[in-house]
């Protein structure tokens, strides 16, 4: 078990502290009802946990300590290194690994994984008991998952097309939510606010209107929308 509190994620935060901050943002979104699907939430928590593990390599730590720039000759982007710490036996590994791998766009990630294996192994050598090999077969699966699904490829197997499409759509959600949580944690801002303020403000506004015009009230459409605040509504004029 790696003690992430020993490694810096940035000047003022350890990897453990930042990861906990990101996880807390995910929990906030879930608790406030912005994440409805339990499955998406569980995958997001895993992605939040692992997304910055790659920063514990010695070159990154040296760069943070010495405040130097990224060295393309001796470093690999941390998002690439991070996925080697994810156990491929966990549920929904491919979606979680893909979300972590592409949560930054610092390089051609798949090319790096295929063509810079020696440097990757060197940077992860100190953590040999905590990492998992990723072969070309898995790299190919990740490449297929991140790209748009070609329906023509599955015209003889619509069920497989349905499965692949669902998996890709779940990846889009998890990756997007990971971005939100990571950016919010890095900026040290609230990720979202409770959606409980608008009704009171509208009621107060109506009371002010009724002081001048006692018969004022909401029209039929407005009443409908107020009664369906938890639903997705499309209104056409």
Task: Please provide the spans of the model-predicted regions.
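Pre-Walker A adenine-sensing motif
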Residues: 216-230
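Dynamic helix-loop-helix/coil hinge segments at AAA+ ATPase domain boundaries and subdomain interfaces
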Residues: 13-15, 207-216
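Residues that form generic nucleotide/phosphate-binding pockets
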Residues: 85, 205-208, 224, 228
């Amino acid at each position: 078990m790696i003690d992430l509190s020993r490694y810096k994620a940035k000047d003022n935060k350890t990897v453990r502290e930042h990861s906990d901050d990101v996880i807390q943002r995910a929990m906030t979104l879930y608790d406030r009802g912005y994440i409805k699907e339990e499955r998406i939430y569980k995958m997001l928590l895993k992605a939040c946990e692992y997304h910055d593990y790659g920063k514990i390599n010695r070159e990154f730590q040296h760069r943070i300590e010495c405040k130097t720039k990224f060295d393309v000759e001796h470093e690999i982007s941390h998002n690439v290194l991070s996925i080697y710490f994810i156990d491929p036996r966990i549920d929904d590994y491919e979606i979680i690994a893909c979300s972590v791998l592409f949560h930054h766009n610092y390089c051609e990630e798949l090319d790096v994984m295929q063509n810079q294996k020696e440097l990757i192994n060197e940077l992860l050598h100190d953590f040999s008991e905590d990492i998992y090999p990723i072969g070309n077969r898995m790299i190919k699966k990740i490449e297929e998952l991140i790209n748009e699904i070609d329906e023509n490829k599955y015209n003889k197997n619509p069920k497989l097309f349905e499965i692949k499409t669902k998996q890709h759509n779940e990846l889009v959600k998890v990756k997007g939510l990971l971005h939100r949580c990571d950016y919010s944690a890095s900026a040290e801002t609230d990720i979202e606010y409770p959606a409980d303020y608008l009704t009171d403000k509208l009621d107060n506004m109506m009371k002010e209107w009724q002081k001048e015009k006692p018969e004022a009230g909401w029209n039929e459409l407005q009443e409908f929308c107020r009664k369906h605040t938890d639903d997705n509504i499309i209104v056409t004029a």
